[in-house]
Amino acid sequence: MKPPILIIIMSTVISGTMIVLTSSHWMLTWIGFEMNMLAVIPILMKKFNPRAMEASTKYFLMQATASMLLMMGITINLLHTGQWTILNNLNPTASTLMTIALAMKLGLAPFHFWVPEVTQGISLSSGMILLTWQKIAPLSVLYQISPNINPKLLLLMAILSVLIGGWGGLNQTQLRKILAYSSIAHMGWMSTILIYNPTMMLLNLIIYIMMTLSTFMLFMHNSTTTTLALSQTWNKMPLITSLILMLMLSLGGLPPLSGFIPKWMIIQELTKNEMIIMPTFLAITALLNLYFYMRLTYATALTMFPSTNNMKMKWQFENTKKTMFLPPLIVMSTMLIPLTPIISILE
């Protein structure tokens, strides 16, 4: 893709998200979602091959269906209240339709099936945008309508997302699919706390975006897409391999890394609200995510997958990719836990 075209497309993607973030009018929000969706499809098809075309088509169909449901919810709400304002009280039917539409855009279970397939079919850079930037707009709308959301519906989708996000990643060998299932699980955690403390959901989102960005950037730096390729990079880029492993353990929520902060704070907040079963379930299902990350770490750092001798040594080429933002991102993705007391201002 030529640089001028890429700049125009990226500007449209950013503009669409910014319109959603700054608007208090339902029609403007919907237009922002449409701008964002139509601009991101060429980014997904950057590598023009059948897999990317299939992934882009799946993404378009899912997002178009979600947009249709969102517009239906907006119309029903307009008929009942006569208001276009987002922060107004919503009609229960409209609220349910909007929640389902936003869940489809986010990839919450049971509307999650497109996320692993689309992520696997596109390049690492496109996958990074899909699993980070594309989560901001739907979550911002959910944040704004959180007082009017049906809590039982959202908790049901959150429970399913955390369970499927952990269970689905267990038998995966493709790193993009592992990160996609991890994204589904993280969306489940965010949806759980949204009802009780929406500000904590934003904290979770920021930490999730930092960890996922760092991981994808290191995979791009390393040109790694499978667990087998990752297990053979120890002799090519030992420092980067060890950083990837730390980031993956942080994504799994292992203390004392940054990924433990949101899980700790969410479980603490749920316990304060006299919920015992939900945080227990979340803690147990978090072990599923941690297990497949630990397995990946073990395979890379402590042992080697079966392979021939000529596969074990890789050529080392000089890497020309710019990594200016990578060091601070890695530091924040792994070492934020001493700053946890500052989060008390959210309460």
From Swiss-Prot:
Protein origin, superkingdom: Eukaryota
Regions that span the bilayer: 3-23, 25-45, 59-79, 96-116, 122-142, 153-173, 178-198, 200-220, 237-257, 274-294, 325-345
Catalytic activity: a ubiquinone + NADH + 5 H(+)(in) = a ubiquinol + NAD(+) + 4 H(+)(out)
UniProt keyword annotations, A-Z: Electron transport, Membrane, Mitochondrion, Mitochondrion inner membrane, NAD, Respiratory chain, Translocase, Transmembrane, Transmembrane helix, Transport, Ubiquinone
Topology of the protein relative to the lipid bilayer: Multi-pass membrane protein
Cellular component, GO annotation: mitochondrial inner membrane
KW NAD (keyword) present: yes
Recorded coiled-coil stretches: none
Molecular-function GO term, any one: NADH dehydrogenase (ubiquinone) activity
GO BP terms: mitochondrial electron transport, NADH to ubiquinone; mitochondrial respiratory chain complex I assembly
Cellular localisation: Mitochondrion inner membrane
Principal place of residence: mitochondrion
InterPro entries: Complex_I_Subunit_2, NADH_DH_su2_C, NADH_UbQ_OxRdtase_chain2, ND/Mrp_TM
EC number: 7.1.1.2
Described purpose of this protein according to its UniProt entry: Core subunit of the mitochondrial membrane respiratory chain NADH dehydrogenase (Complex I) which catalyzes electron transfer from NADH through the respiratory chain, using ubiquinone as an electron acceptor. Essential for the catalytic activity and assembly of complex I.
Similarity section: Belongs to the complex I subunit 2 family.
Subunit (UniProt): Core subunit of respiratory chain NADH dehydrogenase (Complex I) which is composed of 45 different subunits. Interacts with TMEM242.
Protein's name in the database: NADH-ubiquinone oxidoreductase chain 2
Name of encoding gene: MT-ND2
